[in-house]
Amino acid sequence: MKNSFSEYNPKSKDEIENLWKKAIFIFDSNILLNLYRYSEETSTQFIQIISELNNRVWLPFQVGLEFNRNRLTVISDQKKNYTVFEKKLNDLIEEVENKNRNPFFSKSLLEKLSIVKDEVKSEIEAKIKVYDDSITSDSILEKINLTFENKVGVNFSEEEIIKIHKDGEKRFKNRMPPGYCDSKKPENEKYGDLILWKQIIQKSKDSKVDVLFISDDRKEDWWLDHQGKTISPRPELIKEFRTETSKDIYFYKPFQFLEYSNEFLNSEIKEDIIEEVKSYKPDLFKNDNFIQLNLTLQGSIEDFNALFNEMKNTGYNILKESNSVNDFHYLNIFLPNIPDLERRLNSKYISKLSNYNLNLIDIKKS
């Protein structure tokens, strides 16, 4: 049975080792952009491993495009992180140094705090200068350009792009990965993941090679999740790749890439570096102002629309999508990050879906 459904089965140690010996390595744009988000030591180690892969690395045109489009924004965001932290620190120090109200602190403690404040401020200013300088003189960009010199794919023609967009419309309606999680993006952005996927497939077909794809994209249209835990790449993607290319592919998150590099490339990446990469969460997944609940429901379209219209009329900020093939429906609910609102939503609607003749298949919170 394993041969018939191999895309659902975990790879054996021999299969993994064979891929690491023969496959080419393809890195998503988020991997390259994360080099600006990691500490200097981690960033240096990461790009060093990529460079040592030499002719076994390849960059899809779509990855290069997204990296160059977003590089300056990421740099600015990192600078902003330091300026925001500096403001928070100054506000805290000002509160502590206030001698007219509780809490009251000793003079010696305040003197020590002042020294620490000056040291932290000095380091923050140094970090900000690094980001300011990197706008025009970027050592990370230089290393990336050197690593991928003559290893970048060509873009699809305009006709091919139009064809992919049309294919994407059909795939997204059926929630066929990858890319459907971006269906709400502007027209010129929402098919980016699908274009990337097609370029990866084309490279494998042209060069007749297996592929290891390293990505920090955490959306469900790339990864199979179960009860909040990532199990594997989406089986549909593995199957499609094998059908199209007669070759094999596997995905790794960045920390997994580092772990396996120690094992199969004889790298010597320290555990604290791997832990930093593993713990990193992109800013786009953090928003203190609202939460998003993604519900997968099953039932008739009429019952689903009745629920949707009632919630909409009640004032909920929601989006909907349906799959007529299997009667699956998808509800995206956006709530202000106020615990009582989530409790009331659960009490009034989610816990009583049976009253609407609907079954709750899955729920995700972000």
Q: How should each PLM-predicted stretch be described?
A:
Residues 2-211, 218-285:
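Active-site-proximal, substrate-binding regions of enzyme catalytic domains
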Residues 215-217, 299:
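Short beta-strand/turn micro-motifs composed of small residues
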Residues 286-299:
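Short glycine-/aliphatic-rich beta-strand segments at the starts of folded cytosolic domains
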Residues 296-319, 345-346:
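Short amphipathic alpha-helix segments
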Residues 300-301, 334-342:
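Helix N-cap motif at beta-to-alpha junctions
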Residues 317-322, 350-366:
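Conserved short beta-strand edge segments in small beta-sheet-based binding/regulatory domains
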Residues 325-337:
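A generic structural motif
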Residues 341-351:
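Charge-rich, low-aromatic oligomerization/scaffolding segments with amphipathic character
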